[in-house]
Amino acid sequence: MKTLTDSFVYLGHWPSAGSFGFNTDILATNPINLSVVFGVLIFFGKGVLNDLLDNRKQRILNTIRNSEELREGAIQQLENALARLRKVETEADQFRVNGYSEIEREKLNLINSTYKTLKQLENYKNETILFEQQRTINQVRERVFQQALQGAIGTLNSCLSNELHLRTINANIGMFGTMKEITD
């Protein structure tokens, strides 16, 4: 290894008068040496640089293509999610409207049912009151009739004698006989 570096050092010490050689002293470089170095770099580095740039370009294009595919997939998923959201919102609105309608219908049914029940109870109450009034009236009539009958019997028994009683009976029998003849 030492001989290799020594050979480069010897190259740097060649006489520079009228000959072509490499100047290894960076501070003492001239335009010719620089152009040779740049020429070698461009000639050999061009292919490597082109390959690097082509690879980089291909990776960037692949990344862009993948990003576009992912974007399209994301857009499709977003559209699907929005469609599902609209569908769910529509169904929720329908459930809400149907729920409110059902609640209103049940409320009206309950009110109507309660009204009918109250009406029936009112009718039963009125019928019961009417029945109790009739029964009370009949009881009062029966008592009044019994008292009047007892009073009349008492009056008749005290006022009528046997002879008057027999004449009244005979007159009534005569009236019944006359009525029978008229109807025949």
Curated annotation (Swiss-Prot):
Signal peptide location: none
GO molecular function: proton-transporting ATP synthase activity, rotational mechanism
Transmembrane segments: 27-49
Annotated GO CC locations: chloroplast thylakoid membrane; proton-transporting ATP synthase complex
Membrane protein topology class: Single-pass membrane protein
Main location: plastid
One Pfam short name: ATP-synt_B
Taxonomic superkingdom: Eukaryota
Keywords: ATP synthesis, CF(0), Chloroplast, Hydrogen ion transport, Ion transport, Membrane, Plastid, Thylakoid, Transmembrane, Transmembrane helix, Transport
Intracellular or extracellular location(s): Plastid, Chloroplast thylakoid membrane
Function: F(1)F(0) ATP synthase produces ATP from ADP in the presence of a proton or sodium gradient. F-type ATPases consist of two structural domains, F(1) containing the extramembraneous catalytic core and F(0) containing the membrane proton channel, linked together by a central stalk and a peripheral stalk. During catalysis, ATP synthesis in the catalytic domain of F(1) is coupled via a rotary mechanism of the central stalk subunits to proton translocation. Component of the F(0) channel, it forms part of the peripheral stalk, linking F(1) to F(0).
Entry's family note: Belongs to the ATPase B chain family.
Further details from the record: In plastids the F-type ATPase is also known as CF(1)CF(0).
Quaternary organization: F-type ATPases have 2 components, F(1) - the catalytic core - and F(0) - the membrane proton channel. F(1) has five subunits: alpha(3), beta(3), gamma(1), delta(1), epsilon(1). F(0) has four main subunits: a(1), b(1), b'(1) and c(10-14). The alpha and beta chains form an alternating ring which encloses part of the gamma chain. F(1) is attached to F(0) by a central stalk formed by the gamma and epsilon chains, while a peripheral stalk is formed by the delta, b and b' chains.
Protein name: ATP synthase subunit b, chloroplastic
Gene encoding the protein: atpF
